[in-house]
């Protein structure tokens, strides 16, 4: 009975779900807008800088973490650079949008990390998606020309992105962050870039260069370091007790 979560107040569900949904909406919107003005590789790298931003912002929430997480986050960021940025790095307008996007992704991870132990996972995820969907529809109706034929032609990509990439993935995030430090979660989720590169190599016959492989290795190393350091710290603490 000690593991039963107390019933959250309606105010917490609404406020928390709106906060997480707004962060999700802003992160997705800025990411898509930035892609119009920059390359996919640079966008992937800059957006994933949330892996470093999360532990920094967590300090303001008084959520300290161990040195292994900081080192792991920096290794992951360096690995992302090698994996994502191949051309000469110059700052464009789209890069600034992606940079602001990274802060909203970091905020979403931190908010979910705070809410997930307090609100049932499915309830929090559902509220987050409803808020994000409503805000996205409102913005689309104002700034986009919505054509039914275009929606029909993009049915499967829309369903995949909405159900699997967003619905399933972000619900798993909410469930996992009940027992995971936000900084650790951000490092693990940054491995999205590694899976994308490997998937492109296996399924689309894309070339994975030595530079890309080195980037993947650094990111995997950063993830393992952050996790193993935490295990070592907990083991040492239990022995001393």
Tell me what each language-model feature is.
Residues 12-19, 65-77, 95-98, 119-129:
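Cytoplasmic-side transmembrane-helix entry/capping segments in multi-pass membrane proteins
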Residues 1, 154-156, 190-241:
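C-terminal-most transmembrane helix of multi-pass membrane proteins
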Residues 15-37, 57, 82, 99-111, ...:
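Hydrophobic alpha-helical transmembrane segments of multi-pass membrane transport proteins
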Residues 65-85, 105, 134-136, 199, ...:
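Hydrophobic transmembrane alpha-helices of multi-pass small-molecule transport proteins
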Residues 46-49, 68-71, 93, 100, ...:
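Hydrophobic core positions of alpha-helical segments in small-molecule transporters
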Residues 54-55, 87-144, 158, 172, ...:
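Transmembrane alpha-helical segments that form core, pore/gating elements
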Residues 6, 50-71, 194-213:
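C-terminal transmembrane-helix exit sites in multi-pass transporters
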Residues 34, 39, 60-65, 115, ...:
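Hydrophobic/aromatic residues within transmembrane alpha-helices
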């Amino acid at each position: 009975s000690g593991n039963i979560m107390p019933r959250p107040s309606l105010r917490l569900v609404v406020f928390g779900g709106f906060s997480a949904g707004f962060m999700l909406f802003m992160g997705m919107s800025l990411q898509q807008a930035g892609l119009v003005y920059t390359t996919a590789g640079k966008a992937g790298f800059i957006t994933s800088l949330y892996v470093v931003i999360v532990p920094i912002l967590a300090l303001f929430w008084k959520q300290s973490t161990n040195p292994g997480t900081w080192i792991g986050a920096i290794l992951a960021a360096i690995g992302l650079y090698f994996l994502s940025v191949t051309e000469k790095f110059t700052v464009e307008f789209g890069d600034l949008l992606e940079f602001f996007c990274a802060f909203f992704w970091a905020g979403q991870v931190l908010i979910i990390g705070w809410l997930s132990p307090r609100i049932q996972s499915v309830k929090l995820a559902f509220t987050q998606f409803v808020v994000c969907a409503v805000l996205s529809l409102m913005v689309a109706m104002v700034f986009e020309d919505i054509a039914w034929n275009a929606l029909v032609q993009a049915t499967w990509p829309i369903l995949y992105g909405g159900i699997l990439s967003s619905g399933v993935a972000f619900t798993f995030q909410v469930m996992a962050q009940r027992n995971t430090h936000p900084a650790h979660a951000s490092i693990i989720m940054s491995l999205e870039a590694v899976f994308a590169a490997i998937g492109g190599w296996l399924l689309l016959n894309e070339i994975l260069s030595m530079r890309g492989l080195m980037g993947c290795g650094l990111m995997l190393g950063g993830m393992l370091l952050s996790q193993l350091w935490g295990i070592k710290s907990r083991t040492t603490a239990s022995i001393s007790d």
